[in-house]
Amino acid sequence: EQGIQMDRAKLLSEISRYASGKCDQRVVKTWINESAEMIGFVREIMTEKYGVNMIYTYGDEAKWPAENAEHNTDYMYPEIEYTYDRSSGAARNELLLQYIQELGYDVDFKTSLAKLEKNSDGRITGIIAQSTEDDHFIRYNANQGVLLACGGFPGNPYMMEQLDPLGTSVTTACSYSPADKGYGIRAAVWAGANLDKEAAPMLFDRGIVAPGVDAGYVDSDSAFGGKAFPGKIRQFNPGTQPFLKVNRNGERFANESCPYNDIVYAAAHQPGRVYAQISDANFIEDAKRFHTIGCSAQTRNLGEDYFAQQVENGEKEGCFFKADTLEELADKMGFTGAAKDTFLATVERYNELYDKQNDEDFGKPAYRLSAIRTAPFYGCWLGASLLTTEQGIAINEKGQALDTNNQPMEGLYITGDMSGSFFANNYPCLM
C-alpha cells in the first residue's frame, strides 16, 4: 500500500547472518513469503470485522540511518512494522477470542499442559492437560493434530540457568510473562522433539537497578523456583540510547551505538556485569538526534513529559540520579577513590571526542556522540531486561515439529516463541 519493496534475498541473508548460520533458511523463507498474508488475515478481523485500526511504522521512522554504515555494521531491517491502535477498541486478544467463539469454538484458559499423547505409530493424537483450579487431568483428543503455542521459558529459572547461562548472567530485570515456564517445550521434548541447541534470549538494555546490584538471579521466596532478577522496573526505555556507558571502574568499554543486546553482552566482561549510562540536561534533544528505531523510539517521540515520568519512577526506586555537578553524580552513583577519578577523566575524554566529532576510541558514529557539560547531569545503572526466549523446538517450513533425527513428527505443529530453527545467539533487534 505504501509502495515499499522489500529485498527478500537480502533479508534472508541478514536473518541468517544474525543467527551465525544456525537456522533453517527454509523456515525463514516461510516468514518472509507469508507474513504479509498473515498480517492481512489479522487486519481483516481487527479492522473490517471489529473496527480496530491497524497501524504501522514505515519510511524514515522505521528506516536504518545510512550514516551508521560508515563506521558500524550495515544492519538491515524490514521497513514496515505493524501493530494495532489500542485506543480504538477492545484489547486485541479479547477480540480474537470473540472471533473464535463466533466461529463456534471455545477456549479453556484454566489448564496447564502436562504431556502429549501419541499412538503406536508415533503420531501425536492429543494432550493431557491439568486444571489450574482443582488439579484434575483432562484428555483432549486431536484428530487433525496438535498446535503448540505455549511461549518460551523466561519464567523458569531452572531452564534459564541450564539453557542460557550467559543471558541469565547479564540480566537484571524481567518484562516477561511469569506463565512462560517452558512447559510446552518440555512436553514436546519428552515426546521426542528436537530442541534448538543454541540460546536465543530477547534482551533489552533497560534493566535499571540501584548502585552495587549485580546482574543475575537473586533469591526470592515468592518467585517460581525461588529465584528472580533484582530490578524493580520491568523496562526503563530511556536506557536504550547510545549515551556514554561506563563500568564500575569508571571506564568506557564499548561502542554504545549497537543493537539492544550487544551492550549487555559486552557488560558480561565487566565488574558485576552492569554498566552506568551518563548524560546531561540535553537528554531528549540528543535522543532525537540519535534517532533510534523500534520500541526505543518512544523515548524521543513522547518527549520531555515521558522522560520526566521515567525519571520519577527511577528515582522512587533509588535507581536514577540527578546532580548539579559531575562530582556529585559520581558520588550518588557509587564511584569512589580511583574509580571516581577515572569516571571524571572518562567524561572529559568523551567530551573531547564529541568536540572532534570523531570517536577515536570505539568508532561510534559522530551523530550519536553527545556532550556531557550542561547540568543537571543524569546517571543510572543498567543490565538486561529479559522479555522472552526464542530457543525452541526445531520445525520445518510447514511448522511441523522435528524429532531428534530432524524428521517431521506427524500430528505436531509448533508456533510462536516455542518454535525454533529461526534464531540463535540472540533476537535480531534494533538500535
Where are these regions (language model features)?
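A glycine-rich dinucleotide-binding beta-alpha-beta segment and adjacent secondary-structure elements
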Residues: 115, 336-426
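Short, well-ordered coil/turn residues at beta-beta hairpins
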Residues: 130, 142-143, 148-150, 248, ...
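An anion/pyrophosphate-binding glycine-rich loop and adjacent beta-alpha core
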Residues: 185-187, 194-335
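Glycine-rich phosphate/pyrophosphate-binding beta-alpha loops
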Residues: 203-208, 258-264, 384-390, 417-431
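Short, small/polar residue-rich loop motifs at catalytic or cofactor-binding pockets
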Residues: 177, 238-240, 387-389
